C-alpha cells in the first residue's frame, strides 16, 4: 500500500467551494484536486493500492482531513472540477474525530497533519518526507530494496511547504528525506514521479 499525506495550508475547511475559483477563494483547492488526480488516475484505470490524505488548514474550521481510498473510489473523474465536487460534498459534513464516509472511498475527519503521520508510524509503516535535499528516490527503491509488498507513506506540502515545526516533528520520528529532483516541483508532479519510481522498482 502506498499512502500520501498532503498539507494544504490555505484550503478551506467548509463546503463553500467556488468551482469557478478553486485557486483563489477556495484556498488553492486546485492543488488538492491535482494531487488527487495524480495519486489515482491511470489512462484507463485507477491505482487501487493507493490512499491519499489532504489535511486542510484554511478558514473557517481547521484542521479538516479528507481521505481518498483508491480501492473504494467510484464515479470520480480525473478533472479538477469533478474532484472538487466530491471534496465539497465531504466538507459539507461536520467532521468528527473518527473518519466518516462522505461518498464511496472518500472520508472526512477532524484530524491534525501530525496525528495522521503518527498513526502511520505507530502502525509500523515507513515514513518518507519529499524534500529536494534528501536522498535520491532511485537509490532507495531499487532492485535490492524495492517497493513491492511494502507499506510506504510519503509526506508532502503545498506551495507553502509543511513548516519548520512539522519538519522537526518528522525528523524526531525518524522520517527519511527523499529527493525527486534538485529543483522545487509541484506537489502533483511529485506524486507522479513517486509512482513512476515505485512502478519501475517493482519490475526490477
From Swiss-Prot:
<protein>
    <recommendedName>
        <fullName>tRNA (pseudouridine(54)-N(1))-methyltransferase</fullName>
        <ecNumber>2.1.1.257</ecNumber>
    </recommendedName>
</protein>
<comment type="function">
    <text>Specifically catalyzes the N1-methylation of pseudouridine at position 54 (Psi54) in tRNAs.</text>
</comment>
<dbReference type="Pfam" id="PF04013">
    <property type="entry name" value="Methyltrn_RNA_2"/>
</dbReference>
<comment type="similarity">
    <text>Belongs to the methyltransferase superfamily. TrmY family.</text>
</comment>
<feature type="binding site">
    <location>
        <position position="190"/>
    </location>
    <ligand>
        <name>S-adenosyl-L-methionine</name>
    </ligand>
</feature>
<feature type="binding site">
    <location>
        <begin position="180"/>
        <end position="185"/>
    </location>
    <ligand>
        <name>S-adenosyl-L-methionine</name>
    </ligand>
</feature>
<keyword id="KW-0489">Methyltransferase</keyword>
<feature type="binding site">
    <location>
        <position position="157"/>
    </location>
    <ligand>
        <name>S-adenosyl-L-methionine</name>
    </ligand>
</feature>
<dbReference type="InterPro" id="IPR007158">
    <property type="entry name" value="TrmY"/>
</dbReference>
<dbReference type="InterPro" id="IPR029026">
    <property type="entry name" value="tRNA_m1G_MTases_N"/>
</dbReference>
<keyword id="KW-0819">tRNA processing</keyword>
<dbReference type="InterPro" id="IPR029028">
    <property type="entry name" value="Alpha/beta_knot_MTases"/>
</dbReference>
<feature type="binding site">
    <location>
        <position position="130"/>
    </location>
    <ligand>
        <name>S-adenosyl-L-methionine</name>
    </ligand>
</feature>
<dbReference type="GO" id="GO:0008757">
    <property type="term" value="F:S-adenosylmethionine-dependent methyltransferase activity"/>
</dbReference>
<comment type="subunit">
    <text>Homodimer.</text>
</comment>
<dbReference type="GO" id="GO:0005737">
    <property type="term" value="C:cytoplasm"/>
</dbReference>
<keyword id="KW-0949">S-adenosyl-L-methionine</keyword>
<dbReference type="GO" id="GO:0008175">
    <property type="term" value="F:tRNA methyltransferase activity"/>
</dbReference>
<keyword id="KW-0963">Cytoplasm</keyword>
<keyword id="KW-0808">Transferase</keyword>
<dbReference type="GO" id="GO:0030488">
    <property type="term" value="P:tRNA methylation"/>
</dbReference>
Amino acid at each position: 500500500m502506498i499512502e500520501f499525506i498532503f498539507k494544504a495550508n490555505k484550503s478551506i475547511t467548509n463546503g463553500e467551494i467556488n468551482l469557478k475559483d478553486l485557486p483563489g477563494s477556495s484556498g488553492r483547492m486546485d492543488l488538492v484536486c491535482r494531487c488527487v488526480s495524480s495519486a489515482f488516475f491511470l489512462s484507463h484505470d485507477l491505482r487501487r493500492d493507493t490512499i491519499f490524505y489532504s489535511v486542510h488548514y484554511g478558514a473557517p474550521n481547521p484542521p479538516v482531513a479528507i481521505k481518498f481510498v483508491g480501492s473504494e473510489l467510484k464515479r470520480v473523474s480525473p478533472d479538477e472540477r469533478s474532484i472538487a465536487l466530491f471534496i465539497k460534498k465531504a466538507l459539507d459534513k461536520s467532521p468528527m474525530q473518527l473518519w466518516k464516509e462522505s461518498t464511496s472511498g472518500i472520508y472526512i475527519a477532524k484530524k491534525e497533519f501530525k496525528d495522521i503521520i503518527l498513526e502511520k508510524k505507530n502502525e509500523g509503516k515507513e515514513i518518507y518526507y519529499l524534500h529536494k535535499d534528501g536522498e535520491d528516490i532511485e537509490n532507495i527503491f531499487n532492485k535490492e530494496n524495492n517497493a513491492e509488498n511494502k507499506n510506504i507513506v510519503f509526506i508532502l506540502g503545498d506551495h507553502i511547504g509543511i513548516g519548520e515545526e512539522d519538519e522537526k516533528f518528522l525528523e524526531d520520528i525518524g522520517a527519511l528525506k527523499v529527493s525527486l529532483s534538485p529543483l522545487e516541483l509541484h506537489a502533483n508532479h511529485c506524486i507522479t514521479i513517486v509512482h513512476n519510481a515505485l512502478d519501475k522498482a517493482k519490475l526490477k
